[in-house]
Regions:
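C-terminal catalytic subdomain
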Residues: 7-95
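Aromatic-enriched hydrophobic runs in primary sequence
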Residues: 6, 13, 52-55, 83, ...
C-alpha cells in the first residue's frame, strides 16, 4: 500500500530501471541521486527528497503515507539504517523496490507495518483496487503481443 501510493499504476513500475535515475532500491543516501531517499543540502537548507514517485502520483496520498510511516518510526524508536554510498544500483545490501504492481500487492498483503499505519478498510480498499487493476491488465492484449505473435506470420 505505501509503495502503491508512490507508484500507483502498472506503468509506474517501468521507470525503475538501473541507471535511469529512478531509484530501484528503498535505500537512503546523502546527496546520492541513485537512492530512493536523498538527504540534500547543507545547514538550514537541508531537506529529504523522496525520489520514488513519478508524475502519476497523487501527492496527497503519497505525503500521507510517508508521514504516517515516518511518525510510526519515530514513535516506535525504529533504528535508521546507515546511509548507502556510491552507486546504489550496484549495492547488493540495498533492498529492491517492487518491480511490478503485482509484486507491490504481494508485499502489501504480507506487510506487518501497513496495518499499523493505515485503517483496515483503507488498506483493504487500496489492495482490492490494485488487484482489480492488475486483473484488467492481465486480460488485455498489448501492441507488443500483436507485433510479436500476430503480425509475425
Amino acid at each position: 500500500m505505501l509503495f502503491r501510493s508512490l507508484a500507483p499504476n502498472i506503468n509506474s513500475y517501468k521507470r525503475f530501471q538501473e541507471g535511469s535515475f529512478a531509484p530501484t532500491t528503498a535505500a537512503w543516501g546523502i546527496d546520492n541521486r541513485t537512492a530512493g531517499f536523498r538527504l540534500a543540502g547543507h545547514g538550514g537548507s537541508i531537506r529529504i527528497e523522496c525520489r520514488v514517485p513519478g508524475a502519476d502520483v497523487n501527492p496527497y496520498l503519497a505525503f500521507a503515507g510517508l508521514i504516517q510511516a515516518g511518525l510510526y518510526g519515530i514513535e516506535n524508536n525504529l533504528e535508521l539504517e546507515d546511509p548507502l554510498m556510491g552507486n546504489i544500483y550496484q549495492n547488493k545490501k540495498a533492498k529492491s523496490v517492487p518491480g511490478t504492481l503485482r509484486e507491490a500487492i504481494n508485499l502489501a498483503k504480507k506487510s506487518k507495518l501497513l496495518p499499523k499505519i493505515f485503517q483496515a478498510d483503507v488498506l483493504e480498499h487500496y489492495i482490492h483496487a490494485a488487484e482489480w487493476e492488475q486483473s484488467e491488465y492481465d486480460k488485455s492484449v498489448n501492441d507488443w503481443e500483436h507485433q510479436r505473435y500476430f503480425e509475425r506470420g
